[in-house]
């Protein structure tokens, strides 16, 4: 009984058109930012290094290098603040979590590109 109610609430909080992307993909995350009484869209570009959770609580982590420093941001997949997620490039990976990219610098961070036919 309790699980059925939780599943119903979980489905109600999920987006109908959730973004489709995989770990290793280079993505543009368009998120709504509220500054004072104005709302604008901020784009964060980087490599998806992991996904965690399930259902409405699912999160994904995006990593990029800014001015020589690694920056990681976690985004909820089903958040109303996420406008859209664009896949710029698909990467080939054999791991679910790409935390080893944290230790790499420069061209070593690049992943092989998956060819889409």
From Swiss-Prot:
Stored NCBIfam families: rplS_bact
Gene3D superfamilies named among the record's database cross-references: 2.30.30.790
Presence of keyword Metal-binding: no
HAMAP family in alphabetical order: Ribosomal_bL19
GO cellular component, one term: cytosolic large ribosomal subunit
A GO MF label: structural constituent of ribosome
Species the sequence originates in: Rhodopirellula baltica (strain DSM 10527 / NCIMB 13988 / SH1)
Similarity section: Belongs to the bacterial ribosomal protein bL19 family.
UniProt entry tagged with the keyword Metal-binding: no
Reported function: This protein is located at the 30S-50S ribosomal subunit interface and may play a role in the structure and function of the aminoacyl-tRNA binding site.
UniProt keyword terms in alphabetical order: Ribonucleoprotein, Ribosomal protein
Pfam families: Ribosomal_L19
Identification of the protein by name: Large ribosomal subunit protein bL19
One example of a Gene Ontology biological process annotation: translation
Coiled-coil features, chain-numbered ranges: none
